[in-house]
Regions:
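Alpha-helical transmembrane segments
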Residues: 109-117, 199-217
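Hydrophobic alpha-helical membrane-insertion segments
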Residues: 56-74, 147-168, 208-215, 276-286
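Juxtamembrane/interface segments at transmembrane-helix termini
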Residues: 72-77, 131-145, 163-176, 211-236, ...
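N-terminal juxtamembrane cytosolic/stromal segments of multi-pass membrane proteins
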Residues: 1-58, 75, 79-99, 251-254, ...
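Loop-to-transmembrane boundary segments
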Residues: 37-60, 140-151, 194-208, 250-283
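Membrane-interfacial helical/loop segments at transmembrane boundaries in membrane proteins
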Residues: 74-106, 164-197, 236-253, 294-340
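Cytoplasmic membrane-interface regions of multi-pass membrane proteins
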Residues: 33-43, 76-87, 98-104, 122-148, ...
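Alpha-helical transmembrane segments with an aromatic anchor "belt"
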Residues: 108-164, 177
Length: 340
């Protein structure tokens, strides 16, 4: 049967390597002897270690564990401290942001958003420290800082959702809850409240870059796997000496679409598409509720969407944005004098 490398891996077993020499102080902060693990080799490099955390890494883990502990214990308390219910309802449990009445106050009762504030603070500190660690490790190894800036694009979206936009809206209640299904429910309600995010042009761009990232990733991965029988996975060698693998890959794409990327440019395309996904998405979220109250009406005004006729009678204003409260439904009639 022909060798197919979609599922079949070849593991090269060699003596574990400690990595390039760096600053002596940093060398001392590496710990653990590298070992080879066969299961890891099925996913990537089989070597585990040595591990470098350093001061920033340890601090990041410390604050991150505190944040997760706050979320976890609050969720456990919400099911009356039952471990069984905690596991059973984990996907539905949530730590919610402060109530609207607290506005942008930094101090409120713990059960009215105080725990959320503390968890958010520690989680944000943890993420920022981890970013600083990634940046400093790249500098120490003489690398570019592309990975750190890519990570910062994701941090930007996180800060927009939980920090920047709530401040612009004047209330921490606008932030996202900590929870699996609860944050998905928040996303659905957020879109409905502001007239469907699909009409937000920055949301459109974000989805385009997201799908584009997936397409580029699939095209690049498939191309390299297709020419790995010629050594195409050794991309550094292919850059300086293209050889048979790179020539065939380039020729394939010129044949099929008239243009081909290079071994270097495909990674720049992939980096930009991936970075722009959360970057423009964050801009779209930031404009929602602060500049645009209803994206559908905005789209109609700018000839992006048609003005659909109302088919279910007169629309009722959203009480969350207009202050209008619909009248209560009439009480059910009470029938007296009839025995059950």
């Amino acid at each position: 049967m022909e060798y197919q490398n979609l599922f079949t891996q070849v593991q090269v077993v060699a003596p574990p390597h400690h990595g390039v020499s760096i600053d002596p102080r940093d060398e001392r902060e590496r710990f653990g002897e590298p070992v080879l693990i066969h299961l890891f080799g099925r996913l990537g490099n089989a070597q585990l270690g040595p591990i470098y955390l350093g001061g920033l890494g340890i601090a990041s883990l410390f604050f991150g564990i505190i944040a997760i502990q706050i979320m976890g214990w609050n969720m456990l308390a919400s099911v009356n401290w039952s471990p069984i219910e905690f596991v059973r309802q984990l996907f539905w449990l949530s730590l919610d942001p402060p109530l609207p009445k607290h506005g942008l106050s930094l101090f409120m009762p713990l059960n009215e958003g105080g725990w959320w504030m503390m968890a958010g603070f520690f989680l944000t500190v943890s993420i920022l420290l981890w970013w600083a660690r990634m940046y400093r490790r790249a500098i120490a190894l003489g690398m570019g800082t592309h990975i750190a800036w890519g990570f910062l694009a994701a941090i930007w979206l996180y800060l927009v959702l939980g920090f920047i936009r709530p401040i612009m809206m004047g209330s921490w209640s606008e932030a996202v809850p900590f929870g699996i299904f609860s944050h998905l429910d928040w996303t659905a309600a957020f879109s409905l409240r502001y007239g469907n995010l699909f009409y937000n042009p920055f949301h459109m761009l974000s989805i385009a870059f997201l799908y584009g990232s997936a397409l580029l990733f699939a095209m690049h991965g498939a191309t390299i796997l297709a020419v790995s029988r010629f050594g195409g996975e050794r991309e550094i060698e292919q850059i300086v000496d293209r050889g048979t693998a790179s020539e065939r890959a380039a020729l394939f794409w010129r044949w099929t679409m008239g243009f081909n990327a290079t071994m270097e440019s495909i990674h720049r395309w992939a980096w930009w598409f991936a970075v722009l996904t959360p970057l423009v998405g964050g801009i779209g979220i930031l404009l929602t509720g602060t500049v645009v109250d209803n994206w559908y009406l905005w789209a109609v005004k700018h000839d992006v969407a048609p003005a659909y006729p109302y088919v279910f009678g007169t629309p009722i204003p959203d009480p969350a944005t207009s202050g209008f409260m619909p009248p209560a439904a009439p009480a059910a009639p009470v029938i007296t004098g009839v025995k059950p």
